[in-house]
């Protein structure tokens, strides 16, 4: 029987996250890329640099999100040359929105723009499929996001420190990896503030384990029977 899964487009499945904190933003993503039922790449990088202080998290079709990122990077470079100063995060978000909206019938991708500029500080913009742009204190996207809305409602708070924001992002991505079959691999993060951008990498064996992944704990009856293999009543 012919297997058509390998002929399907690369999909980033994906969990992508952007969080603001008191001083900047933290972006995070898993690393699994799928082709049909197959994992095409288990260590892909879904956080793409647009400028020195602006990055984009990509989900959906790998080809679509990559070509949009390439065009946005090119236009931002031209913008910087013409104006003599770096583009703001809002400009990057609006360019991404414009490309997504004008090609909404042909693109299958959702993105999160995050960065820092001297005018507005750290900003996060969510751009779902279709080309809407939403400024948010935090944004989540991709197939793993459906498992995270309740978690973020409880865990996110205004005015977090950098350490708290980084821990929140890594914990959230690891939770999505445990629940979502299309998310997996490692966790990559980018922290962006006035000092620039810092990338971090968290391997799969260093991530927090969740309920289904923990070793089963024996019940009290199991312990009793294990310590007394001979029946107490003959």
Swiss-Prot record:
MF annotations from Gene Ontology: endopeptidase activity; threonine-type endopeptidase activity
Propiece residue ranges: 1-13
Subcellular location: Cytoplasm; Nucleus
Catalytic activity as recorded in UniProt: Cleavage of peptide bonds with very broad specificity
EC category name: hydrolase
EC number: 3.4.25.1
UniProt xrefs under Pfam families: Proteasome
Coiled coil: none
Stored PANTHER family: ATP-DEPENDENT PROTEASE SUBUNIT HSLV (PTHR32194:SF0), METALLOPROTEASE TLDD (PTHR32194)
Family named by the database record: Belongs to the peptidase T1B family.
Name the UniProt record assigns to this protein: Proteasome subunit beta type-6
Species in which this protein is naturally found: Nicotiana tabacum (Common tobacco)
Species classification: Eukaryota, Viridiplantae, Streptophyta, Embryophyta, Tracheophyta
């Amino acid at each position: 029987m012919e297997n058509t899964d390998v002929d399907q487009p690369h999909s980033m499945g994906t969990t992508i996250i952007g969080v603001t904190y008191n001083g900047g933003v933290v972006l995070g993503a898993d690393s699994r890329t799928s082709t049909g039922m197959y994992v095409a790449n288990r260590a892909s990088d879904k956080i793409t640099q647009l400028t020195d202080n602006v990055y984009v998290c990509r989900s959906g079709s790998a080809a679509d999100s990559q070509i949009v990122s390439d065009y946005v990077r090119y236009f931002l470079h031209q913008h910087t040359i013409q104006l003599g100063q770096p583009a703001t995060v809002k400009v990057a978000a609006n360019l991404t929105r414009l490309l997504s909206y004008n090609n909404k019938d042909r693109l299958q991708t959702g993105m999160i723009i995050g960065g820092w500029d001297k005018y507005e500080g750290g900003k996060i913009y969510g751009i779902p499929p279709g080309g809407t742009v939403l400024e948010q204190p935090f944004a989540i996207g991709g197939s793993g996001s459906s498992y995270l809305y309740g978690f973020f409602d409880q865990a996110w708070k205004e005015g977090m420190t950098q350490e708290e924001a980084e821990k929140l992002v890594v914990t959230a991505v690891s939770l999505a990896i445990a629940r979502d079959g299309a998310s997996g691999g490692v966790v990559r993060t980018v922290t962006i503030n006035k000092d620039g951008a810092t990338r971090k990498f968290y391997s799969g064996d260093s991530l927090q384990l969740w309920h289904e992944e923990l070793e089963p704990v024996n019940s009290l009856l199991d312990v009793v029977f294990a310590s007394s293999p001979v029946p107490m009543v003959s």
